[in-house]
Amino acid sequence: MRFAPYLISAVVITTIILGGAWWTSAMDTKLQTKMKEIIDQHTSTWTPVVSSVTSTQTDTLRVTISEVVSVTATLTETFTATPTVTSVVHALATTDPHPDNSKIVILMGSNFQNDANSPLHPFAQSIIKNRREYAERHGYKFEFLDADAYASRVTGHLMPWVKVPMLQDTMKKYPDAEWIWWLDHDALVMNKDLNVVDHVLKHDRLNTILTREAEYKSGAGIPADGFRTPKDQDAKDVHFIISQDFNGINAGSLFIRNSEVGRWIVDLWFEPLYLDHIQGYAEQQAFSHMVFYHPQVYKHVGVVPLKAINAYDFDDNIWGYDDGDLCIHFAGCNYFKNCPEKFLKYAQILSSKQGSDWMSAQEKDHIQNLLKPSS
């Protein structure tokens, strides 16, 4: 009987593992069912598949179809699947190879302007002004949404989720917009002369910066190494632009095309099953899950270098900010409790180029006092 405790422990661990696998598989089955419902709501985006596809399921959760790379697991089951839909390029009328500036919307959402305990509260109006004036300079539209007004839509969930219904509402509010650029509140536009159409969005430019066949960083939402971005992706097929860091996909800065494909992706992203079951990295983890498990999402997501749209305050030539980069994102500053320090570092850089005009009138004196060298 001396082995009884070990046997009991082994049984308990095995039960937990099998139970977790069952729960995860059941969740993914529900997500697949819900995804089909959402697809059916956007019927003009999809066309029927006429032939069956024989595929090997090498992961208990993921059906490997088309160009998606399969991964090897212990148990392998071969089956024949006839998908009901496959994605096609959206109408050319909404995939302009060189969108007009007037059809770009910069979206920002936060409650830091209301919350005196927010570490960036003393600088909130200047950050908003920085974003708005950049939009006005290039003829983009600017939309700021109060996160407190969206709290009821993510009750019981982490606040970063509010960006998804904000995207949904903005896409509806600006039906003629071509692209929505979401940039987190803990960021500053650093190069006011850089036009995001020329820098990222026009097809010939996007085709030069897409990271094709690059490995997605494994982690939250992407459980396996060796999963890569599409090999032959073309800008005309991209409806979602994002970047990744050492933790994987980072949703602090992203571009979403206001097309049926784009709206479908956002609708799936806000599926209640994701909100209820995904914690940790919240909306980032959910989006990673979508990319990894759903080929229809995978093929329309373009990954670009972090520095192109989402530079960090790192001493690193891959992720770190360099003079001339579009923006700086203080990623993780809440966790490291250094948001004010990050802001002031880049406020100093902006002031050396633009003086104090970028600051809000009510915050200018406070910021300038903080920027004075200590005696």
Curated annotation (Swiss-Prot):
- InterPro entries named in the record: Glyco_trans_34 (IPR008630), Nucleotide-diphossugar_trans (IPR029044)
Q: Which UniProt keywords apply?
A: Glycoprotein, Glycosyltransferase, Golgi apparatus, Membrane, Signal-anchor, Transferase, Transmembrane, Transmembrane helix
Primary place of residence? Golgi
Q: Name one GO molecular function term.
A: alpha-1,2-galactosyltransferase activity
- The chain's Lumenal topological domains, given as residue ranges, are 24-375
Which enzyme type, at the first EC level? transferase
State what protein this is by name: Alpha-1,2-galactosyltransferase
